Regions:
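Terminal alpha-helical segments
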Residues: 1-127
């Protein structure tokens, strides 16, 4: 567990909320994504030596739940399976906003902020 990364994740989440309120929806989505990403990294710790956390891969490792239940099997559904789809959507919205320059609507931006909030809350419950 990395308290510094979790602190950064919370800060990014605050930024996402502020951007959402200001109507800067694409930026809110991007900050929400990185809030969740940094929170997952905080929970998982650093990747194995010589590797790095890939954006889609970190979701799978996080959802598996072995970061808080190390004896949990490596196959079958993860302990945080209820977050998998939302995290994938958050990633896709971020790609849409940052790379494809797709306009994001308020409902989608709110969904992204909620996903980041839920991700951080799941971690805070377990640390």
């Amino acid at each position: 567990m990395s308290p510094d990364r979790l602190m950064i994740a919370r800060r990014y989440l605050d930024d996402a909320r502020s951007l959402l309120l200001a109507g800067r929806l694409e930026s809110a989505v991007s900050r929400a994504y990185y809030a969740a990403y940094q929170a997952m990294w905080a929970a998982l710790g650093n990747p194995p030596k010589g590797e790095q956390w890939r954006h889609i891969g970190i979701n799978s490792h996080f959802v598996r739940g072995r970061w808080f239940e190390p004896a949990y099997p490596q196959t079958g559904p993860g302990l945080l399976e209820h977050l998998r789809f939302s995290l994938h959507r958050l990633y896709q919205f971020r790609v849409d906003a940052d790379y494809d320059l797709t306009p994001i609507n308020t409902k989608s931006a709110e969904e992204c902020v909620r996903t980041a909030e839920r991700t951080i809350a799941e971690i805070e419950q377990r640390v």
